[in-house]
């Protein structure tokens, strides 16, 4: 069947890239973009990075919108349905429901992303925020500007970026992490500890292996009670304990839901005309032969485009294969990771994690390099990503690292002569 109506549910990066890819592929039919937020699609990473980092009085950080109204209307020719989430899906009649509104489709890309996990019994307190949306970031930035005593719950990437912004302002900040070592799922135990040491080096208190018993206050948060009995005074609490895929609206739709929407390697859900992309897509990555659900900018952009192209031409659908990539900025340093952290060996091939502000670690599985983690290694990280994509051997990766080390040493020696 020829596709005349493309509907994209999700007004963030994956949804936008789906729309753009459809038009770039020559699709001339109607496109409807449904977004739960009232804002035009905007870039999320800056919300916990440079958007929070603006500290100069009178300087307003630009809101990171991807495109203006005129681009959506005139260039992409998209009907925008913003400010209300999708509430249901009828795959037999090919209808997406947004409240009482029924929107028909021939092809559908679901890119509803993820939602923040919250602490129980915290909804009644002002001053408690997650960080997922533009409105979240605006509220947190206002509190930091006012000098709020800040407690960040969860030492993951988002929470740590908030702590970095607080520290930049000279705000008193403490990070609380329930696990003994932060970032284990993202980078492994050894390197998680190495990254977490950036907090201590920059004067941020990090408490690990301790959970939160309760948040206390009279209408507004005043204290964080930890499960070891200690109490932290707080005017602002930022909760960064992870996310879960936004799939509740799809219950009973016929789609398979298991840690997201279960897809095949082409991002097809198994239901005619329906594809998924971004945080919500659980798909088998042919690069590593494992099922993944990725929560990063790169995957959202790539999957959104792939899902749209495949939805418009399912007979020629192509698998989505990738080497995952994410980055995070803390205290003026950039952390970058490519690949997967599941490995038999992690080897530091450049620098010293305890003393240097630049280092590189590689991850081995069998005889192959499967991951690389760098601190301030912007010039090398994508070279390792290409090596992983090419399924380079561990020996080749070590040889490459040694050549880089020797070259750097030679340059340093020459400059000192």
Please provide the spans of the model-predicted regions.
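FAD-binding core/adjacent interface of flavoenzyme oxidoreductases
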Residues: 1-9, 66-151, 227, 238-240, ...
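Mid-to-C-terminal Rossmann-like scaffold of FAD/NAD(P)H-dependent oxidoreductases
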Residues: 2-5, 280-378
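N-terminal Rossmann-like FAD-binding beta1-loop-alpha1 element of flavoenzymes
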Residues: 4-27, 151, 158-167
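Residue-level detector of alpha-helix initiation sites
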Residues: 12-16, 38, 114-116, 135, ...
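N-terminal Rossmann-like dinucleotide/flavin-binding domain of flavoprotein oxidoreductases
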Residues: 21-105, 187-205
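FAD-site-proximal beta/loop scaffold in flavoenzymes
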Residues: 126-147, 219-225, 230-306
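Rossmann-like dinucleotide-binding cores of NAD(P)H-dependent redox enzymes
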Residues: 149, 157-214, 296-299, 319-327
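C-terminal auxiliary extensions adjacent to catalytic cores
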Residues: 353-415
């Amino acid at each position: 069947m020829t596709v005349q109506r493309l509907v994209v549910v999700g007004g963030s990066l994956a949804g936008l890239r789906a729309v753009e890819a459809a038009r770039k592929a020559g699709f001339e039919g109607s496109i409807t973009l449904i977004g739960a937020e009232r804002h035009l699609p905007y870039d999320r990473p800056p919300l916990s990075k440079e958007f929070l980092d603006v500290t100069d009085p009178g300087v307003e950080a630009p809101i990171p919108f991807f495109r203006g109204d005129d681009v959506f209307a005139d260039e992409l020719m998209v009907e925008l349905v913003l400010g209300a989430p999708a509430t249901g899906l009828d795959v037999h009649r090919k209808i997406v429901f947004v409240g009482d509104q029924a929107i028909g489709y021939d092809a559908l890309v679901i890119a509803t992303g993820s939602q923040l996990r919250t602490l129980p019994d915290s909804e009644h307190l002002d001053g408690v925020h997650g960080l997922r949306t533009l409105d979240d970031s605006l509220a947190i930035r206002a509190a930091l500007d006012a000098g709020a005593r800040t407690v960040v719950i969860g030492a993951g990437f988002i929470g740590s970026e908030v702590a970095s912004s607080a520290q930049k302002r000279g705000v008193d900040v403490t990070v609380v992490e329930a696990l003994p070592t932060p970032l284990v799922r993202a980078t492994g135990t050894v390197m998680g500890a190495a990254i977490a040491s950036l907090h201590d080096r920059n004067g941020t208190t990090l408490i690990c292996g301790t959970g939160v018993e309760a948040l206390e206050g009279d209408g507004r948060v005043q204290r964080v009670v930890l499960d070891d009995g200690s109490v932290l005074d707080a005017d602002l609490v930022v909760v960064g304990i992870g996310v879960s895929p936004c799939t509740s609206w799809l219950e009973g739709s016929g789609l398979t839901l298991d840690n997201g929407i279960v897809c095949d390697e082409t991002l097809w859900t198994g239901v005619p005309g329906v594809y998924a992309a971004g945080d919500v897509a659980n798909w088998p990555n042919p690069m590593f032969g494992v099922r993944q659900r990725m929560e990063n900018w790169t995957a959202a952009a790539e999957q959104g485009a792939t899902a749209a192209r495949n939805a418009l031409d399912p007979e020629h659908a192509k698998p989505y294969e990738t080497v995952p990539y994410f980055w995070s900025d803390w205290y003026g340093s950039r952390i970058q990771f490519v690949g997967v952290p599941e490995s038999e060996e992690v080897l530091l091939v450049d620098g010293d994690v305890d003393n240097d502000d630049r280092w590189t670690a590689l991850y081995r599985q069998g005889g192959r390099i499967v991951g690389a983690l760098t601190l301030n290694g912007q010039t090398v990280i994508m070279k390792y990503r290409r090596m992983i994509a090419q399924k380079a051997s561990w020996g080749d990766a070590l040889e490459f690292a040694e050549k880089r080390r020797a070259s750097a040493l030679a340059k340093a020696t020459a400059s000192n002569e």
